[in-house]
Amino acid sequence: MLSIRASTKGNIELASSAFKFDEAYIRKGKFEVEYLTLAYMTFQGLGEEDHKAVEQARMILRELEKLAQLALNIADKAEYVKFANVQDLHKDEYGLKPMGDITAEMIKKAVEAFVSGNSKHASETLVMMTEIQGLYDSAFNKIKSSVNDQNIINHTGILSILEDVKDAAVISCSIASHFC
């Protein structure tokens, strides 16, 4: 979410800070979770149900890594994309803020479905994809109708950010689909 906001404001420092603030902590945690889940699956002789839970945790970890890469991609694009209303915090010409907010909620609900075993969270995540698709379609149509020779590079960059946010929502649906 921070990388989306930073890209809409053209704030490269903010975008990169989203990942620098505790990069070592995140890497250490990822390493520990990845290795612990692998060790449990391989060496602990888990029962079928426990093995499935650990396997699902590893799947979520891998999907979260993809989400992190998308966030990095968005942050990297911040310096190359210019939005018309960067000074007005509440103007969002392409719906990126609501897309980011909804996607963040989708990710949270998908992981909650795993943790709580509540399939309602997973189902809600899948339903929220309709909102994301609507926002994406609206932004896509706006970009497509306003592109010209002078702004094609910038509009393509904005479209690329929209694609990354939508892809993050799709990943949350992929996680959620395992728990419906």
Predicted feature residues:
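Cytosolic, long alpha-helical scaffolding segments
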Residues: 1-180
